[in-house]
Amino acid sequence: MASIGTPLTPTATRILLLGSGELGREVALEAMRLGVEVVAVDRYPNAPAMQVAHRSHVVSMLDGAALRAIIEAEKPYCIVPEIEAIATGTLLELEQEGYRVVPTARAARLTMDREGIRRLAAEELGLPTSPYRFASTEEEYRAAIETVGLPCVVKPVMSSSGKGQSLVRTPADIDSAWAYAQTGGRAGAGRVIVEGFVDFDYEITLLTVRHAGGVTFCDPIGHLQKDGDYRESWQPQPMDAVALEKARAMADAVTGALGGWGIFGVELFVRGDEVWFSEVSPRPHDTGLVTLISQNMSEFALHVRAILGLPVPLLRQNGPAASCVILAEGDSEAPRFHGVDAALAEQDTALCLFGKPEVHGRRRMGVALALGDDIDAARAKARRAAGSVTVEL
């Protein structure tokens, strides 16, 4: 893109965000720094990205007709999905009609559930993955466990943030894992994936940027998961040189198959110099929030540059860095944060509070960010900062 218009005028360069959570908010802010007009869409009002966007719409993004009506009215330069739960059939139609979907409508479709992307990675591209089977009924599920063996991981094919996910260690866990998967998926009861457990040393997110100038890899991000959801991340994760080369080759293959420009969060398991593909998101990744402090350009800045066709120069690491999630649990429609002063008292710390308007159950409300002399020091500092913040519900 050689030129950018002025927001709220006939020359505006407009992007439309589908999903307006914390990741969408950061994308919106980076786009607005470049003078881009931002329209935010989500299923609930006052979502984080809506609080900073030029305009917003509240609609179920699984309602294809409603989604089409908004897109046809807004006529965006590009449509930027931030979540998986979207009427991807409608996106495919709109792309065929000339609308641009980031990175592509096919990528949005394949990654909206675990089956599409696993079949692409393992069966079409031949990438190493854990053994797996898909099941639609309880009978198929039990047969899948028999084939894959114990221990194994059971997940709804459509879910996020660990919802519906269980580790099945013994036969006593089989019934409860099926029941949880049937209630925890985005589409309610439905199909599951049964994955063999990989005995890995660590897992990483390899942020991969496909842009007009080629492909750029961020340094690998290590992360800690609890109940299937991200709790901490750090960068750079030390890696064997052979493993890093394999990881980059896998990331290049899967993102190349998905196509388009933008940032992709490629999740991989690593043991020694062995690497297994796990999942990919064709958008900024929650573990990549650490790049708000770790790099000269965050994953959000990189995403916006890539989708606008702007240059992505050499990335610079600011030093060992870490993030730690700030959680709240309970019910509230007006959360308040305490201890912000204490959290920011240490040198080289920062907070990113998401501005989520409600809490019902457990919800990620922000992250603490820190630089340190090494990864352990950065992680400890980020944990201290996060621990200083309490959320009043």
Curated annotation (Swiss-Prot):
Pfam family, one: RS_preATP-grasp-like
Keywords tagged on the record: ATP-binding, Ligase, Magnesium, Metal-binding, Nucleotide-binding, Purine biosynthesis
Binding site for ATP: 114, 155, 160-165, 195-198, 203
Alphabetized GO MF terms: ATP binding; magnesium ion binding; phosphoribosylglycinamide formyltransferase 2 activity; phosphoribosylglycinamide formyltransferase activity
Pathway: Purine metabolism; IMP biosynthesis via de novo pathway; N(2)-formyl-N(1)-(5-phospho-D-ribosyl)glycinamide from N(1)-(5-phospho-D-ribosyl)glycinamide (formate route): step 1/1
GO cellular component annotations of the record: cytosol
Reaction(s) catalysed (UniProt annotation): N(1)-(5-phospho-beta-D-ribosyl)glycinamide + formate + ATP = N(2)-formyl-N(1)-(5-phospho-beta-D-ribosyl)glycinamide + ADP + phosphate + H(+)
UniProt-listed InterPro entries: ATP-grasp, ATP-grasp_carboxylate-amine, ATP_grasp_subdomain_1, PreATP-grasp_dom_sf, PurT, PurT/PurK_preATP-grasp, PurT_C, Rudment_hybrid_motif
Superkingdom of the organism of origin: Bacteria
Record: residues binding Mg(2+): 267, 279
Ranges of residues in domain ATP-grasp: 119-308
Binding sites annotated in the UniProt record for N(1)-(5-phospho-beta-D-ribosyl)glycinamide: 22-23, 82, 286, 356, 363-364
Its EC number(s): 6.3.1.21
Enzyme class, UniProt record, top EC level: ligase
One of the protein's GO biological processes: 'de novo' IMP biosynthetic process
Biological role: Involved in the de novo purine biosynthesis. Catalyzes the transfer of formate to 5-phospho-ribosyl-glycinamide (GAR), producing 5-phospho-ribosyl-N-formylglycinamide (FGAR). Formate is provided by PurU via hydrolysis of 10-formyl-tetrahydrofolate.
Description of how the protein assembles with itself and partners: Homodimer.
HAMAP family: PurT
Recorded family membership: Belongs to the PurK/PurT family.
Annotated protein name in UniProt: Formate-dependent phosphoribosylglycinamide formyltransferase
Encoding gene (name): purT
